[in-house]
UniProtKB/Swiss-Prot annotation:
Pollen. It is an enzyme of class 1 (oxidoreductase). Residues 22-143, 196-296, 411-521 form the Plastocyanin-like domain. Gene3D superfamilies: Cupredoxins - blue copper proteins. GO terms for cellular component: extracellular region. Belongs to the multicopper oxidase family. Its main location: secreted. Induction: Expression regulated by the haploid gametophyte itself. Keywords: Disulfide bond, Germination, Glycoprotein, Metal-binding, Oxidoreductase, Repeat, Secreted, Signal. Glycans are attached at residues 31, 59, 108, 332, 352, 423. The keyword Repeat applies. This is L-ascorbate oxidase homolog. It comes from Nicotiana tabacum.
Amino acid sequence: MGSGKVTFVALLLCLSVGVIAEDPYLYFNWNVTYGTIAPLGVPQQGILINGQFPGPRINCTSNNNIVVNVFNNLDEPFLFTWNGVQHRKNSWQDGTPGTMCPIMPGQNFTYRFQVKDQIGSYSYFPTTALHRAAGGYGALNVHSRALIPVPFDNPADEYNVFVGDWYNKGHKTLKKILDGGRTIGRPDGIIINGKSAKVGEAKEPLFTMEAGKTYRYRFCNLGMRSSVNIRFQGHPMKLVELEGSHTVQNIYDSLDLHVGQCLSVLVTADQEPKDYYLVVSSRFLKQALSSVAIIRYANGKGPASPELPTPPPENTEGIAWSMNQFRSFRWNLTASAARPNPQGSYHYGQINITRTIKIFNSMSQVGGKLRYGLNGISHTNGETPLKLVEYFGATNKAFKYDLMADEAPADPSKLTIATNVKNATYRNFVEIIFENHEKTIRTYHLDGYSFFAVAVEPGRWSPEKRKNYNLVDGLSRNNIQVYPNSWAAIMLTFDNAGMWNLRSEMWEKTYLGEQLYFSVLSPSRSLRDEYNIPDNHPLCGIVKGLSMPAPYKA
């Protein structure tokens, strides 16, 4: 063969390898509209995606590229966030008011992101206004690649279950209440996949199982404020995954699931073939709320028993029970996640802490209106997304960094309304302590990262409490609960450049200021660390019409 032919063949081989090596793309077109729904039997305006509530399920595989073209047919600006997706180098697609201009009514926007080096159970939902109270949410499941071993046999099927509290008031009414300075109060009920039912009501089954087979149930709590407890009538649950981590496979009769959290369990259909109830009940509310759904055996005979499994205790005893359950959630050190190497090959407990950030939540009246905040700052969104302001070098016109200190002020209950942006040094390993001095539970989520949940304890934190940390097999996750009059500790490396939202997952509190943004800048301004602004990214506010900055280079 001549040298020219050899060169040509070699070039073809290189090109074919390049094509094969690119990860697959999945494309979705979503039409976001209003529609009448009645989760608790009261007709109200809901937010539908392609006519569905809950919305369409995204089923993908680790490293897939996801392309979602969203058409906003509402009468208000709208955004989706992809809760738990890390968006490596790409906070442009995170879908929060601090990173993106909203999709205006009658307009569309195409999200493009990669589920890089992730597996697990996640969700998407609206971040604008109080839209989450009207629906607009759904599942985002990331499966392991074919060559990566999974620490359990393939289930017969997978089912996504969205649970949480619900309000009969519409999202615009709820927003008006908050804008008027009042709380939205107690929810009206609990829903399961957009519906509710009581024992004895004739309802279609939520899911069907075949006797002798095992099923994977992916649960997410996308309510507004209430923790819930999940239990199957007559069927124990084997916990196998929580927010992207394979867990030690303990067996549970019931599981607490806090707002914003997702987990996976295996349930085996090994009982008498008939109907059984899935029970979801509220936690830590003065007046308990609950709902049931029917799980039916194929070819089964007989209704579900009216005798429901006993819920866990409430009040102080219930908090201790739930805290102990948290401690039982541990990382499966020998299992692989998105990569072939075992999860336990990352020894987070041996890394030196470079910074400790203590965060106190509080509530207060500001100008006669209810506000929530962190370390004395109640966050407010400006007219321009923070990421755009920073990228265009216009921060002096929009916000000041580090108004919030790493320690709580002497009187954290005194709140100042301001844009809350903290600098974080790229690739530093940090410890974040959450202290909750309130009488109600909190849950917090950090975009762009998974962190190690090393402790949840009663009382107040002090450096001596580090001896209680789990430095070996704490779960890598993206959401942490903080019980009343308790604290929680997480550890992470700020190795993902971008602008990332730390927020309460209880949307009333988020809307009224209980959130902040971490600015994580790479000093090299290199494409190795962060992507340039996408070509289709809309500009708004003070950066609209400005010349584009010099792009990052490889």
